[in-house]
Amino acid sequence: PDPVKRVVRHQRLNSGSASVSVAFKSDKMVNIYWGDGTVDTDVYGDCTGKNAISHTYTDNGIYYIIVAGVIEDITDFETNGIVVWNRL
């Protein structure tokens, strides 16, 4: 398994809160586990600003997003979710 870099909490209440985004920079590949069974694999590069990675949930609920990869190489991390764990 990948080392965990960040755990982010997102709550979908309705269609207005359906999307969450994560932005970061990494020269190494990371995987994003969105908490609903969906995974974006081998994401790397400048994923900030307009290149931020986003995900839209179809069902209401609380989701925990895990950004996993080489811990030391993920920088400039931002999200519109709530960061639960900074590093594990």
Model feature map: region roles:
Residues 1-88:
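N-terminal capping/linker segments that flank leucine-rich repeat
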